[in-house]
Swiss-Prot record:
InterPro entries: Restrct_endonuc-II-like (IPR011335), tRNA_endonuc-like_dom_sf (IPR011856), UPF0102_YraN-like (IPR003509)
Domain of life of the organism encoding this protein: Bacteria
Disordered: region residues: 1-20
The protein's name: UPF0102 protein Ent638_3585
The family this protein is said to belong to: Belongs to the UPF0102 family.
Pfam families: UPF0102
Recorded GO MF terms: nucleic acid binding
Length: 131
């Protein structure tokens, strides 16, 4: 039996996952243009997911990618809640442990790449361990 593709209930529209993947790829390419090197995408851990992991010089950068059509409800950057920050921190901690590292031994930061309409905003060090 054939499977119904995601988003098939909305002909001509992408599923949420397809839309997210497209914006994450756009963010990755944009950041590579800024000199960052790609390490991994869509890294899962206990209840959380890191959209992109990249390297900026010697710094490991955990990146959350957000998109909003408009800033009517606060824009993309405002959508990274404290709860979301905690999930990202937990997932980063697990990823570092899997790679024989920790927040104490590896220089890292948490960035947000926010697309609001056609605007892009790169928030370096958007939050940290004390979130």
């Amino acid at each position: 039996m054939a499977q119904i593709p995601a988003g098939a209930d909305r002909p001509g529209k992408l599923s949420r996952k397809q839309t997210g993947d497209a914006w994450e790829l756009k963010a990755r390419r944009w950041l590579e243009g800024k000199g960052l090197r790609f390490i991994a995408a869509n890294v899962h851990g206990r209840g959380g997911e890191i959209d992109l992991i990249m390297k900026d010089g010697q710094v490991i950068v955990f990146i959350e990618v957000r998109f909003r059509q408009s800033s009517r409800f606060g824009g993309a950057a405002a959508s990274v809640t404290l709860a979301k920050q905690h999930k990202l921190l937990q997932t980063a901690h697990l990823w570092l442990a899997r790679h024989n590292g920790s927040f104490d031994t590896v220089d890292c930061r948490f960035d947000v790449v926010a697309f609001t309409g056609n605007d892009i905003e790169w928030l370096k060090n958007a939050f940290g361990e004390d979130a």
